[in-house]
Regions:
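Non-catalytic, substrate/partner-engaging modules appended to enzymatic cores
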Residues: 1-381
Length: 381
């Protein structure tokens, strides 16, 4: 497979919308929503931290330096953007809590502010969040483009959006996935196992994005062309589909088509299950009750079946499903932005947007769907 970045397809068909977005502490804010309420008792202090111009890992090093706590003792649910104003929850052993107030000034000098202190019986672990609330400010926005943006947001609110991994996943030079493949091929290796695992996961992410874009292409072809033309397309791709199946797929109201053999998942969290009655599952998809999933290949990955598997096979890799430490999983192909709010400030030519996304989903994917710029990984995160 070609490992160079190819343009990823958009869900909707509007022309590109011109505006400026700068990922900065003024124009981009991220607020973590915790997975559970904290009990206010237990051996772990839980602090809500606001950081500015720092990555999560840089923040952890600062806490370690100032408080004397080992980085391994600090718990966090996920990585937050460096070029943003962000809040997230950090856990640390209770004995360090008295040092927080004493070091308020030292922390503020390093662009960190403690917003709240609580306690809980367990350490926060990766993935212990529901999702994130986002705020974005777009600049140099004309009234016409503001109207177009609102129309796109209406579509996204109704039908959702592709759950692409954001460009942050692939590094400054868009080559993390290439390094991940080299690790699998035993062509390179780094001293830190976490770095090796992250780079391999970047390769998984690259394959997922490519699979999702391919599925979008197939969905658009099903919607836009006749059954006869579709039969010819699938025949050329050596995919076995009959005319009755194609008619049923064209009748699905959602722009992203659920195929025979898809692995579904209850939304926003729940168990995986096979799509058996496609019409029924498409209706549940429209109601935001269940969503089709895509492959993150690995040793214990759950694979699709039938037509969905025929397409998925192109994006599997034997080195991933034989790698002992790469277990694999599945990821929502599609997500739904919630609590979407927007306002256009005409005199400033600015458009302000707020929304919520579930964990693992990227604001840059929503920006990409709105802006429709040509090329890949040109978002400004």
């Amino acid at each position: 497979m070609n490992l160079n970045f190819m343009p990823l397809l958009h869900a909707y068909n509007h022309a590109s919308i011109d505006f400026h977005f700068n990922s900065s502490t003024r124009d981009f804010c991220v607020h973590e929503v915790p997975l559970y309420e904290f009990s206010n008792t237990g051996e772990h202090a839980v602090i809500q931290v606001r950081k500015s111009g720092l990555s999560t890992l840089e923040m952890l090093h600062i806490f370690s330096q100032i408080l004397g706590v080992k980085i391994a003792e600090l718990g966090y649910a996920g990585l937050k953007d460096k070029n943003a104003l962000t809040t997230q929850f950090i856990s640390l052993p209770k004995k360090y809590a008295p040092l927080l107030e004493k070091n308020t000034h030292n922390l503020q000098e390093r662009n960190l502010k403690i917003l709240s202190l609580n306690y809980h019986h367990n350490k926060i672990k990766l993935g212990h969040l529901k999702g994130n609330r986002f705020f974005m400010r777009f600049k140099k926005m004309t009234p016409l483009n503001a109207q177009k943006t609102k129309q796109v947001l209406e579509q996204i609110t109704q039908f959702g959006m592709p759950n692409y991994f954001g460009s942050q996943r692939f590094g400054k030079f868009n080559d993390n996935h290439k390094e991940g493949l080299k690790i699998l091929q035993n062509k390179t290796k780094f001293a830190h196992q976490k770095l090796n695992a992250f780079l391999i996961s970047s390769y998984q992410s690259y394959l997922f994005n490519a699979l999702l874009s391919k599925r979008l292409e197939i969905s658009k072809i099903i919607s836009d062309f006749s059954v006869k033309e579709n039969l010819e397309f699938f025949k050329q791709k050596n995919l076995s589909v009959n005319s009755n199946t194609l008619k049923a797929l064209k009748n699905q109201a959602h722009p992203f088509k659920i195929l025979e053999g898809d692995v579904m998942c209850h939304y926003p969290y729940g168990k995986f299950f096979d799509a058996l009655e496609l019409g029924k599952e498409s209706e549940r998809f429209l109601k935001k009750e269940a969503v089709p999933t895509g492959l993150l290949d690995g040793k214990k990955a759950l694979y699709a079946k039938n037509l969905s598997l025929e397409i998925e096979k192109e994006f599997q890799h034997n080195l991933l499903n034989s790698h002992a430490k790469t277990l694999g999983s599945r990821r929502f192909f599609w997500v739904f932005a919630e609590n979407v709010t927007s306002q256009y400030i005409k005199e400033k030519a600015q458009f302000e947007l707020g929304f919520y996304l579930p964990k693992g989903s990227y604001a840059s994917a929503l920006l990409k769907e709105i802006k429709h710029e040509e090329g890949e990984n040109n978002d400004e995160f």
